[in-house]
Amino acid sequence: METATLRPTHARLARLAGAYAGTESVYHEAGGAAGETTGRFRTNMGLGGNFLVIDYQQEQFGSITRLVHAVVGVDASSGRPTLHWFDDRGEDPGAPALGDWQGDDLVFERRTSRGAVRLAFGAPLSDGDGLTLRVDASADGATWSPALEGRYRRADWDRRTR
């Protein structure tokens, strides 16, 4: 059986692996209900280290308000990260979004039926225990507004269900 060759991008993705929890500020419906929320991530490298598998949940006022399952890989021809996004809204996930590293941030732009969304995952902070997420939304793909900003620390995964 032939296996894919791991690239330097895979090692960068592996830095994001772990369990995280933290506070989020939600500004726009694309990020959930406006206000303060708690976000939890569980991320791990799967399938021989070829993919970063992300499970995310958002909680507000004691209820789960958002669930996401995402898979980040590497495009074989370009070497760019790819994002496959699935959430509890049941929207057609469409084609994977292509991303780029901007410093320590992994940034994706994806189109949805509601417009464009830009996600920026911040690589763990210098102490290796932190993760950041910024989500911006745009109706026209030109003018962007903050939707969500979160700061997370390594934590036990305490997944609730709804």
Q: Where are the regions that the model predicts?
A:
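Hydrophobic small-molecule pocket/channel-lining residues, especially in calycin-type beta-barrels
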Residues: 1-162
